[in-house]
């Protein structure tokens, strides 16, 4: 399936905006890609579309729980299987979510930076078929500083 077909099927748009297509083509060709776009510029589509075009799970690392929940809801509303793991969830909820990523044919797993370093995530990650990793809202890292979250100090 080509990228424009995915865009049309899930978002209802006939064409990409601005540099979206350039970013998508770069990601789709397997290159590490930094996509810088303004708020409301459609950044999420630039990693969601190529992730949908390939098998496997897209791991999305983002520090903002509200954004995670919003993105997951938006994807689910479009019929795309997505799930989030964040603080405030019980261990059982986290295990179920991660196992769903192994066995449940999910396309997107949204996770906070702190969760990357947990034993349960590291263990479950070994069984996941991750095809793509995205860091969303990466500007927050420099805004918060080096000592905001310990995971970034490794």
Name each model feature, range by range.
Residues 1-38:
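Conserved pre-motif I regulatory segment
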Residues 24, 48, 95-98, 122:
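Short hydrophobic/charged patches on amphipathic alpha-helices used for structural packing
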Residues 29-35, 56-57, 105-107:
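Pre-Walker A (Motif I) flank of P-loop NTPase domains
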Residues 30-49, 61:
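Walker A/P-loop
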Residues 35, 60, 109-111, 133-134:
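Hydrophobic positions in the central parallel beta-sheet of the AAA+
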Residues 51-53, 75-77, 100-104, 123-128:
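Conserved catalytic network of the ASCE P-loop NTPase/AAA+ motor domain
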Residues 59, 65-111:
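Conserved nucleic-acid-binding Ia/Ib motif block in the N-terminal RecA-like helicase ATPase lobe
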Residues 121-153:
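SF2 helicase catalytic motif II
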